[in-house]
Amino acid sequence: MLDLRKDPLVRPPHTGRRLAVAFCSLAVLLAPVAAHASAPAPAGQRGATVSAGTGLAQEKRLKSWGNNRSGQLGDGTWTDFRTTATTVLGLTSAEVVKIAAGGGGAANGHGLALLTDRTVQSWGANGSGQLGDGSVFSHNAPGQVVNLSDARDIAAGGWHSLALRDDGTVVAWGRNNYGQLGNGTHNDSSVPVRVEGLDKVTAVAAGLHHSLALREDGTVWAWGHNANGQLGDGTSAGRNVPAPVNGLTGVTRIAAGCDHNLALTGQPGDGADPTGGNAVKAWGHNATGQLGDNSTVNRYTPVDTQGIWLGGVAHIAAGCRHSLAVTDSDHKLKAWGQNTSGQLGDGTTDHRITPVPVPGLKGVQLLAGGREHTVALLGDGAVRSWGANGSGQLGNGTTTESSTPVTTLTALTGVDKIAAPVGGDFTFAN
């Protein structure tokens, strides 16, 4: 039998590396499976390390950079951090459908990858069972989530994870102190459990201690922590089963920050395109203006983000305390909320309570927000990032923060997916 205490890919719980820092720090398969602890990854799967400003390795693989104190980079090491891209062991780019990053502090982070065979791989911190492998041992290389074989979407929270199944139901695993697993209890689970009362779900999202689901009818359902109104039900009472967010219909996209949320909808509103385009709705924590409603007042039901409509909105994303949107007509970026480390990318460190443009970026296709950094994928496959960089999460070979975008990976690398944890300081690209 494998001795987990001696395996280099496995870290037992309760080591100093696993200290959970709850500062507002935060985007499946029924078969006999080989869990994380089965064996080290085969030789030759490590791949080549990529330096800043270079293309991906010839054999394209999932890449990671930034904090690695809990093995969240998945490269088979416990190296504290990496300032340039390394390779996640054993996962080729071609087999990865979606990636998700979770975490709630410098010493806590985990990753998820949805594969073409509909299974989910996980790695990193696991003190609350957030890897879903039936253990609470951290792992620095991917292993399979157990008892799920039909995933179509994934999300990673601070210490918990979610997966949407083919039948439209949702499963969750990991920490459950606030009911964020949605199964009617407050008991942690190291294996997937079904979220109660949800069907016909099309997408999921996870905050630091809460969860969201978008249903086919355009409604949004929420559960978990609610001290700042992040469940959007008009109260501050937590819920361990899902409940609808008040007044939201026609929603097409959702995003979760540490304690706030965004929804993209075609509903008219003060922040919507007067020509009939869509609107961004926001609710929850608002101390640094992350709701974009020209205030710093927490909102317990959705409000309109102001001045975002120019050309419509194509994509939304949330960091811990900041928010992001890409305009539909010209794929330019707007940002608002906390800007302590320059994560808004506007060349300042001033918080913004309404959206401001990020200069110098065109053709933005996807966005990801971390605790205090932001990542953008451009149409040519290039990755740009900005904000905090103390753990190398910008991937440009330094630990110097930047309030304007810097180059992480050059154009034409074939990248089409990015992820960052709303409560953490690392990044994935595939």
Regions found by a protein language model. Name each.
Residues 2-3, 8, 12-430:
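Eukaryote-biased RCC1-like beta-propeller repeat architecture
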